[in-house]
From Swiss-Prot:
InterPro entries on file: Nase/OxRdtase_comp1 (IPR000510), Nase_comp1_CS (IPR000318), NifE (IPR005973), NifE-like (IPR049939)
Protein's UniProt name: Nitrogenase iron-molybdenum cofactor biosynthesis protein NifE
Pfam families recorded: Oxidored_nitro (PF00148)
Functional summary from the UniProt entry: This protein may play a role in the biosynthesis of the prosthetic group of nitrogenase (FeMo cofactor).
Lineage: Bacteria, Pseudomonadati, Pseudomonadota, Gammaproteobacteria, Pseudomonadales
GO terms, molecular function: nitrogenase activity
Length: 474
């Protein structure tokens, strides 16, 4: 990818902080090889497209280090679960065999699995030696009759967020707009309900949580053409240009997709979240507002009233156990503010939140929810996290899996909230799942046990000693 193309991706007019100085390649830090590069960002953004063959063109470590980093789930095809790579070695680089290996890898994927498309992810090594991945993909598509989409996402281009944008740009350039949506199935129309087509951009169906939101949209007559990219299919991505409204779910990483769909097709968009009662209700209201359908607005308010009453009644027995508990939330991106709302719905107080991967808009949402004097953690090493826990008397640390051992060493209750988790927390009914896990974590008897002084640390008392002989006989 040329430098001017990277600069264009970094230039995002829809961001209010767009005029600030931008840095394409972040300064390397210890531990940075665990991901967070452009390749990692591009792959986790598109890997949830379940029926596509995903080929990583590069050394095998690139495929191995990033595969399955995001716990997305599919309701059908599982081809995305198969890790494919060209496994470049030193000999391939020296002898100039990298492009040939890629061509044969595409052929093997097409002949073995018959996918509707193949996504090829460029990495650092082939980018440095000058492989023409675009030309190879074009030749393979003509030869095998299957779309082959190049995703030029070499890790040294920049950060994980840039990789998300590169992935979105590839979809805009090669996929979106290449097919029209299917007509509504015969007999699926409901009298008096007009069906509206919508997209969800940046929804990854972590632990299947989107499946708990989809019934709400179906009830309102909102047909989801595509979720980019959780539980998505290639043919669905092709039809995204025909949506009436786009919802930006995962912060601003794929904002370029929403903006360009608006510029090209006039599709309005908004940013929202399905975490917590308040944010879920607001997202449904925003759909109704932008679609400008009075009947939809009335039905939306009725659904919100019903669901809120039901979930608040179910939460009432738990509230007394959680109200007033103090939370240190250390995560990034959209979760730095979207998880605050459900915790506040439970009467809990978020004393600090992590903003390492948060945009300026994310930070503005945090201040709106928690006040201007909120504690934001840009860096969260073990020392900083434990110091913050002590300083703010936090009862629980809610963070990603990599912080689990920090919490355990500090004897602090810990709940994993990041993309690797096994439980979904999106939608109204999954609030109960979040509450259950928070309660289980806080009330686990192990915390009382590990905080209790060991017997050998308790000063011996003369009165506590048995009288008499060595065995206490009188």
């Amino acid at each position: 990818m040329k430098a001017k193309d990277i600069a264009e991706l970094l230039d995002e007019p829809a961001c209010s902080h767009n005029k600030k100085e931008k840095s394409g390649c972040a300064k390397p830090k210890p531990g940075a090889t665990d991901g967070r590069c452009s390749f990692d960002g591009a792959q986790i953004a598109l890997l949830p497209v379940a029926d596509v063959a995903h080929i990583v063109h590069g050394p095998i470590a690139c495929a191995g280090s990033s595969w399955d980093n995001r716990g997305t789930r599919s309701s059908g095809p599982d081809l995305y679960r198969i890790g494919m790579t060209t496994d470049l070695t030193e000999n391939d680089v020296i002898m100039g065999r990298a492009e040939k290996r890629l061509f044969h890898a595409i052929r093997q994927a097409v002949e073995s699995y018959l996918p509707p498309a193949v996504f090829v992810y460029n990495t650092c090594v082939p980018a440095l030696i000058g492989d023409d991945v675009d030309a190879v993909c074009k030749a393979a598509a003509e030869r095998f009759g299957t779309p082959v989409i190049p995703v030029d996402s070499a890790g040294f281009y920049g950060t994980k967020n840039l990789g998300n944008r590169i992935a979105g740009e590839a979809m805009l350039k090669y996929v979106i707009g290449t097919r029209e949506p299917d007509p509504l199935p015969v007999g699926s129309e409901r009298p008096g309900i007009r069906v509206h087509d919508v997209n969800l951009i940046g929804e990854y169906n972590i632990a299947g949580e989107f499946w708990h939101v989809l019934p709400l949209l179906d009830e309102l007559g909102l047909r989801v053409l595509c979720t980019l990219a959780g539980d998505a299919r290639y043919r669905e991505v092709q039809t995204m240009h025909r949506a009436e409204v786009n919802m930006m779910v995962c912060s601003k990483a794929m904002l370029n997709v929403a903006r360009k769909l608006q510029e090209t097709y006039g599709t309005p968009w908004f940013e929202g979240s399905f975490y917590g009662i308040t944010d879920t209700s607001q997202a449904l209201r925003d759909f109704a507002r932008l679609l400008d359908d009075p009947d939809l607005t009335a039905r939306t308010e009725a659904l919100i009233a019903r669901e809120e009453a039901k979930v608040r009644a179910a939460l009432e027995p738990w509230r007394a156990r959680l109200e007033g508990k103090r939370v240190l939330l250390y995560t990034g991106g959209v979760k730095s503010w979207s998880v605050v709302s459900p915790l506040q719905d439970l009467g809990m107080k978020v004393v600090a939140t992590g903003t390492k991967k948060s945009t300026e808009e994310d930070k503005a949402r945090i201040r709106e929810l928690m006040g201007d004097d909120v504690k934001m953690l840009d860096e969260g090493n073990a020392r900083v996290l434990l110091k913050t826990v002590d300083e703010y008397q936090a009862d629980i640390l809610i963070a990603g899996g990599r912080n689990m051992y920090t919490a355990l060493k500090g004897r602090v209750p810990f709940l994993d909230i990041n993309q690797e988790r096994e439980f979904g927390y999106g939608g109204y009914d999954r609030m109960l799942e979040l509450v259950r896990h928070v309660c289980i974590t806080l009330e686990c008897p192990v915390w009382e046990a590990v905080r209790r002084p060991a017997p050998w640390d308790i000063p011996a008392s003369q009165d506590a000693r048995p009288s008499g002989g060595p065995f206490g006989e009188r």
